[in-house]
Amino acid sequence: MKIAVLPGDGIGPEIVAEAVKVLNALDEKFEMETAPVGGAGYEAEGHPLPENTLKLAKEADAILFGAVGDWKYDSLERALRPEQAILGLRKHLQLFANFRPAICYPELTGASSLKPELVAGLDILIVRELNGDIYFGQPRGVREAPDGLFKGAREGFDTMRYSEPEIRRIAHVAFQAAAKRGKKLCSVDKANVLETFQFWKDIVIDVSKEYPDVELSHMYVDNAAMQLVKAPKSFDVIVTGNMFGDILSDEAAMLTGSIGMLPSASLDANNKGLYEPSHGSAPDIAGKGVANPLATILSAAMMLRYSLNKAEQADRIENAVKKVLAQGYRTGDILTPGCKQVGTREMGEAVLAAL
């Protein structure tokens, strides 16, 4: 089994290194090949997603991704900025389903920004559609306004759109995920304002007929944002579009105490996937050895479960992380009184020891 390892920028190389150590400690034979991506790709090849990196990603059975982005690239034209690498990989590999779990471990309830009783036992899965919506809809750009109150003025415009096949496939993925969990699915939309999401709602309702054992509910995105803070444990699986999912999954991340704890998976129709932590490249702490590697290590566990069919090994890693937390090891982002503060490498070593 071949794994493409794409560390990226900022803290990416540090946290990916710890996940690779954990994978190497398993009783499995993985072929792991590393390639530059993001700012590192731009420095090496003049493009955030070099041809050889894309070729490797296409050939691999799964991709372990770090993070991309750095302020020093903000002056580049948009097509050359590091963040275009992840968008390019999603597009070329047809990664349409993003899984973002938000789990609050018992030991970390004190690190959450909410009261412990609101988040204790929290286990949400957000299923986000990745290939459509306003992020990719055409046409888009800057032009002279052709009509309206400010006709002739410069305006920016984007297009929100979803096709029926796009909605159906993400709905099926979400219903199947809910069927394996608490059998509750909440579809988040803005059907009261947007035609696109009235259409979304209609299609999701139609797909629901194939899953009679799953309870389907609907919620407007503004209310969903409020309920995630007010009563987060009322959710099990949430399915939504690209932009809403982008925002809600980051909000849900902070319910858990730190975005540094949350893995994610982006899958194609055959469960080949790209696995990455939910956080960014954090260039302000890069090289300091203080970043939390647990989200990346847990992303490696998701990779084993969804793309490599190694569920038992995934369980081993997840249980090792739970053990390390129970032992009181904490990086700075999840530190609470009475716990032992460690750095990136020490946290990785603790997980290895727990394995």
Curated annotation (Swiss-Prot):
Main location as per UniProt = cytoplasm
Q: Which cofactor names does the annotation list?
A: Mg(2+); Mn(2+)
Q: Quote the record's binding site residues for Mg(2+).
A: 222, 246, 250
Give the first-level EC class, as a single word. oxidoreductase
GO MF assignments = 3-isopropylmalate dehydrogenase activity; magnesium ion binding; NAD binding
Give the quaternary structure.
Answer: Homodimer.
Q: Which family does it belong to?
A: Belongs to the isocitrate and isopropylmalate dehydrogenases family. LeuB type 1 subfamily.
Catalysis: reaction(s): (2R,3S)-3-isopropylmalate + NAD(+) = 4-methyl-2-oxopentanoate + CO2 + NADH
Q: At which positions is substrate bound?
A: 90, 100, 128, 222
- Organism equals Cupriavidus pinatubonensis (strain JMP 134 / LMG 1197) (Cupriavidus necator (strain JMP 134))
Pfam families annotated for this entry?
A: Iso_dh
Annotated pathway: Amino-acid biosynthesis; L-leucine biosynthesis; L-leucine from 3-methyl-2-oxobutanoate: step 3/4
Q: Summarize where NAD(+) binds, as residue positions.
A: 280-292
Family matches, as Gene3D superfamilies? Isopropylmalate Dehydrogenase
Q: What does this protein do?
A: Catalyzes the oxidation of 3-carboxy-2-hydroxy-4-methylpentanoate (3-isopropylmalate) to 3-carboxy-4-methyl-2-oxopentanoate. The product decarboxylates to 4-methyl-2 oxopentanoate.
One GO cellular component term of this record is:
cytosol
Q: Where is this site: Important for catalysis?
A: 135, 190
Manner of cofactor binding, per the entry note: Binds 1 Mg(2+) or Mn(2+) ion per subunit.
Q: Which UniProt keywords apply?
A: Amino-acid biosynthesis, Branched-chain amino acid biosynthesis, Cytoplasm, Leucine biosynthesis, Magnesium, Manganese, Metal-binding, NAD, Oxidoreductase
Q: Where in the cell is it found?
A: Cytoplasm
* Designated name of the protein: 3-isopropylmalate dehydrogenase
Q: Tell me a GO biological process for this protein.
A: L-leucine biosynthetic process
